Structure formats: C-alpha cells, structure tokens
UniProtKB/Swiss-Prot annotation:
This is CRE-binding bZIP protein SKO1. Residues 454-461 are annotated as: Leucine-zipper. Residues 138-194, 305-329 have a biased composition (Low complexity). Residues 430-451 are annotated as: Basic motif. The modification Phosphothreonine is found at residue 113. Present with 504 molecules/cell in log phase SD medium. Residues 51-85, 357-368, 396-405 have a biased composition (Polar residues). Residues 429-492 form the bZIP domain. Keywords: DNA-binding, Nucleus, Phosphoprotein, Repressor, Transcription, Transcription regulation. It comes from Saccharomyces cerevisiae (strain ATCC 204508 / S288c) (Baker's yeast). GO terms for biological process: cellular response to osmotic stress; negative regulation of transcription by RNA polymerase II; positive regulation of transcription by RNA polymerase II; regulation of transcription by RNA polymerase II.
Length: 647
C-alpha cells in the first residue's frame, strides 16, 4: 500500500493502534541493511533515490504526514512521547496508523547492545516541535533542508541560541559534540507551500500518544533510537533545535564536524530531515508518524584524522558537564500553549536527561569499540608509565637518601681495599727484592767460591807437579833411568843392556849389588850412603809423609768449610792415609853378612841387575833386591835399615 493510499484512509486512529506489540516486534527482521539515523528508507524508495532526494520530495512527504497528524484526535495530556526505538534489532516494525495498513519500516541507529529485552525507552519530544506554535513562516526561503558549513562551527543539536533544549550555546566544557555554523538555518514553510498552519495540533497529538511500550530493559540501558550522538562512522542529525530566529535559507556547503576533539571537513554533505511544518523531527517520530525521510548524507563514512584520540570518556565528560537544562526550554514553550502539558513535558525531559547520560556511555559501532580498546591500552600504558615513573622517582629519592651513607661506605671500603692492595703490592715487591738480593748474594758467593776452588785446584796441580819432578829424579838415579829435560814429556829410560863394553854402572842399585858380590864391603857401603842421601833429599822425606793439603786447610781458617765441601764432593782426591807408602817393608842391615859368597860369573850379576830394573816397574815393592835364591835372606830383614843416615 503506497503512502498516498495511507494518507486517504480515515483519520480515526485509537491509542491502542499506536501501541507497538512486543510479540510482533520479536519477529521483526534485523538482517536488513543499516542506514544512518535520521534517514528512514521507505519501502517503495531505493537507497540511491533516498540519497539523492531533493527538497520537493521532502515537501511532498511532509504534506502527507501533516494530513495524518491533523486527523488524529488529542487525548490525555499527561502522556509521554518516546524518541528511542529498540537497541537490539537494527530495524523494528512500528505500528501503523490505521488497521490493515502496511507497517512502516523503523530503522534504529547502529547502537547495538547485546542482551536486554525488546522494549524501548520512551521517545523524547523534539524541542523544535514545542516552538512550532510560536514559529513564523518565512516566505522568502524556498529550501526545506538543513545545511551545515564549516565556516563558523557551532552546536547544531546540542545547543541553541534561544529557547532550545540547550539554551546555552556552549557547554561548560567549552566543546560540543556537533558543530554547526550559526548562520545556517532551517527554513519553515507557510501555508502556501502546502503545510497546515495549525501549529497547536502537533504538540497536542504528541502529548496524547500513549506509552509505546519502549521502556528500558532490565539492565537499565536504552537499547533503541539514540538521537544526539554523532560518531565518526554515522554522522546523522540529532535533535535539531532551531527556533524562529535561526530559520534561514539552506545552502549546499561543506560540513565541519568536531568529533573527539578534532575537526573533520567533509565537502558537499547535505543533511536532510523529515519535517512537519518545516520543523525537523527526530528519527523515532518520523518512523512512528509514517514520514519517509529522504535526507541522505552524501558521504556517510568519514575518515578519522590521525589526531582523533578522545573516546567515549570525553563524550561522557562533555555531555555530563554541559549543564543540560531541558526544563527551561520546555517550560518556556509549553506555558505559552497549554499549562496542562507542562508537567508531562518536564517529566519526559527529565527522563531524557537521564537516558541521554546513559546512552552516551554505549559504544556506537565496532570502530568505536576498537578506538576504545586503543584508548584503554594507551591509558593503561600511560598509567603504567606514570606509575613506573612515580615509583622510579620515589625509588630515586629513597636511593638518594640511602646512597649517601652507602657511597661513603663504598668510598671507605674502596680506600681500605686500595690500601690493602697497596700493602699487598708493597709486600710482594719487598719479597721480590729480598729474593733478588738473596740471589745476588748467593751468586756473588758462588762466584767467589768458584774462584777460590779454581785457585785451589791450580795450587794442587802445582804441588803434584813439583812432587812428581822430585820423585822422578830420585828414582831415576836409583834405577839408572835418565829423566827427560821436561817433566811433562814421556820418560826416556836408558837401560844398559848386558854387554862387555858398557856395564850397568849408572844404577846405584846395580853398583851396590856388584860390590856386594865381590865382597867389597867398602864400595858397597859407599853406594848405600849415596842412595840414602838421595832419598833424604826428597820433599816427601822432609814433610815426614804428611799431605800438604791438610796443612793448607789448617793454615787458612776462612776456607775450612769450602775445603770440607770440596773433600766431600770430590771423591777423586785420595786421602793421605789411603796412599801407599813405598818404603813400608824394611830389611835389617845385617842381612848382607848372610849373603854367601859364590863363584858366580859376571853373567849372573847382569841377570840380577836386569831383574832389579824389571822389579822397579812391575813389582809392587821395587826396593827389594832380588839376590840369588840360595843366598836370599830367610829372615826377610830390611836391607835399607843398614844404610847410614845423615842426621
């Protein structure tokens, strides 16, 4: 059924017919496409047509709606009007004015709250309708749309300069949710444009509407239409409070919307409102009155600026601190028309104030939720950062108080540790110097002992050389051996061979033997005396057989220790007592008398001399004279004992 046919229906509509049925609303479809609040899609109108509607379309539908409004009688004056629809469903069906008519489609704003009942809070009467009776027509204006410009931003729905819901043009916080240029006005039409001029019927009709059943749910949260909230994603008009002083011609200009503390400029945005007598209505009233709205935002989705950081907390603060005084404007409008309606309007305005404060706390869409999460994260991060900074400052203060003595203790400990380290270093240096000094002294002593030992060895060598030379000369004379000119050279032994021409007369031992063999005792005694003289001239006989090294150790007391060490370490030096004495076997002098005379020949004497020479080099007792075996002294007396001694 078209809107023209509905407008021709009888105007007998009861209050019961206007009451929405919750049971029917529970079956209402919520899968339909979302539309911006303030723009209600008519079943017979497509989206593109609703976006591009002109002012003539608004005028046509406004005439139809006004005819329906004038045909509804007034009833109880204390009934309230709601301006909110169900929150849980995006679109809800509203009751039709006449039985049998097709119910218009009610599109709720995209403020969806999970849970709650299907009942909606009562609708708020638009303050601009209250001033309908006092408003005057302006025949010079031809447009019925509301245009918003960014040339001079001011409050569009939150405040009005005179007699609106918000009498003050600015909130105490100095900000408003929606800005509008003060010179942008909404035009109203006169009777010549097709609108009735009976202004008293509209408030009466609205006040005679019974309760629509759209009451708050159990959680006391409004879930229906929420006029007055303009978010970044859904920039729909809310509660346009425009009085007769601000009604001027509209212009298609740019719009500057201040959202969350940032100004957004959106060119060519035309906001169209459903109007009754040229006065805009709220989306809830337009749906209840079966008024199709053709006003569409040209650019419904706006991009948020990077500086948009304020969230619903700022919205709540700006709204709660803006000193809402709907009672003042409501009282001023109602007292001029009907004093009986004053109480109901005041009550509804009070309810609207409470519901408005609750509604502003609800997030409008997913983007708003995301921004809220971001804000919470930023707030939590900033709060944690501030807490951390406070803790750090407190800890720095405490540490500044506690570190003063701690630093002193550390300095003292460092000094002590440094002193200990210095002492340890000095001790190590002292020990090192002492060690080096001991090594130096030991090295010097060792060098000194080495020099002394070398000198001692040289002296020993010289001593043994002199002793060797002395003994060599004596033994050479006794044996008839002529030593060489040099003591270091090999011995040159000239042994006389037995021959007739050269008897062995050079050997004293041989001469003595020959004298004895001839029984020439006088010659024998002379040979023995010579031999005794040679032996007495030796150094060994003069020392009495003592070791000269022992005498040197006794004379030099300073070298006693070194000498003992040398003796113990050098076992190659034989001791004095271990040296054999050559003349340890003595023979008696009277043994020569026992020698028997024999008629031996010279050959026998020669053999005896040869045996004597051989015995000097091979026999251990070279001084034993080997006589004939039959003439050998059986008593074994020492022969040298009979030799004369030169005392």
């Amino acid at each position: 059924m078209s809107s023209e046919e509905r407008s021709r229906q009888p105007s007998t509509v009861s209050t019961f017919d206007l009451e929405p049925n919750p049971f029917e609303q529970s079956f209402a479809s919520s899968k339909k496409a979302l539309s911006l609040p303030g723009t209600i899609s008519h079943p017979s109108l497509p989206k593109e047509l609703s976006r591009n509607n002109s002012t003539s379309t608004i005028t046509q539908h406004s005439q139809r709606s006004t005819h329906s409004l004038n045909s509804i009688p007034e009833e109880n004056g204390n009934s309230t009007v709601t301006d909110n629809s169900n929150h849980n469903d995006v679109k809800k069906d509203s009751p039709s004015f006449l039985p049998g008519q097709q119910r218009p489609t009610i599109i709720s704003p995209p403020i969806l709250t999970p849970g709650g009942s299907k009942r909606l809070p009562p609708l708020l009467l638009s303050p601009s309708i209250l001033y309908q009776a006092n408003s005057t027509t302006n025949p010079s204006q031809n447009s019925h749309s509301v245009s918003v410009s960014n040339s001079n931003p001011s409050a569009i729905g939150v405040s009005s300069t005179s007699g609106s819901l918000y009498p003050n043009s600015s909130s105490p916080s100095g900000t408003s949710l929606i800005r509008q240029p003060r010179n942008s006005n909404v035009t109203t039409s006169n009777s010549g444009n097709g609108f009735p001029t009976n202004d008293s019927q509209m408030p009466g009709f609205l006040l005679n509407l019974s309760k629509s059943g759209l009451t708050p749910n159990e959680s006391n949260i409004r879930t229906g239409l929420t006029p007055g909230i303009l978010t970044q994603s859904y920039n729909y008009p809310v509660l346009p409070s425009i009085n007769k002083n601000t009604i001027t011609g509209s212009k298609n200009v740019n719009k500057s919307v201040t959202v969350n503390g940032s100004i957004e400029n959106h060119p060519h945005v035309n906001i169209m409102h459903p109007t009754v007598n040229g006065t805009p209505l709220t989306p809830g009233l337009s749906s209840l009155l079966n008024l199709p709205s053709t006003g569409v935002l040209a650019n419904p989705v706006f991009k948020s600026t990077p500086t948009t950081n304020t969230t619903d907390g700022t919205v709540n603060n700006s709204i709660s601190n803006s000193n809402f005084s709907p009672n003042t404007s409501t009282k001023a409008a109602v007292k001029m028309d009907n004093p009986a309606e004053f109480n109901a309007i005041e009550h509804s305005a009070h309810n609207h104030k409470e519901n408005e404060n609750l509604t502003t706390q609800i997030e409008n869409n997913d983007q708003f939720n995301n921004k809220t999460r971001k804000r919470k994260r930023r707030m939590s991060s900033t709060s944690s950062t501030s807490k951390a900074s406070r803790k750090n400052s407190i800890s720095r203060k405490n540490s500044a108080v506690t570190t003063a003595p701690a630093q002193k203790d550390d300095v003292e400990n460092n000094k002590i540790s440094n002193n200990v380290t210095l002492d340890e270093n000095e001790e190590q240096e002292r020990k090192r110097k002492e060690f080096l000094e001991r090594n130096r002294v030991a090295a010097s002593k060792f060098r000194k002992r080495k020099k002394e030992y070398i000198k001692k060895i040289e002296n020993d060598l010289q001593f043994y050389e002199s002793e060797y030379d002395d003994l060599t000369q004596v033994i050479g004379k006794l044996c008839g051996i002529i030593p060489s000119s040099s003591s270091n050279s090999q011995f040159n032994v000239n042994v006389s061979t037995p021959s007739s021409s050269s008897p062995p007369s050079t050997s004293l031992i041989a001469l003595l033997e020959s004298s004895i063999s001839r029984s020439d005792y006088s010659s024998a005694m002379s040979v023995l005396s010579n031999m005794k003289q040679l032996i007495c001239e030796t150094n060994f006989y003069r020392r009495g057989g003592k070791n000269p090294r022992d005498d040197m150790d006794g004379q030099e007391d300073s070298f006693n220790k070194d000498t003992n060490v040398v003796k113990s370490e050098n076992a190659g030096y034989p001791s004095v007592n271990s040296r054999p004495i050559i003349l340890d076997k003595k023979y008696s002098l009277n043994s020569g008398a026992n020698i028997s005379k024999s008629n031996t020949t010279t050959n026998n004497v020669g053999n005896s001399a040869q045996n004597i020479i051989n015995s000097c080099y091979s026999v251990t007792n070279p001084l034993v004279i080997n006589a004939n075996s039959d003439t050998h002294d059986t008593n074994k007396h020492d022969v040298l004992s009979t030799l004369p001694h030169n005392n």
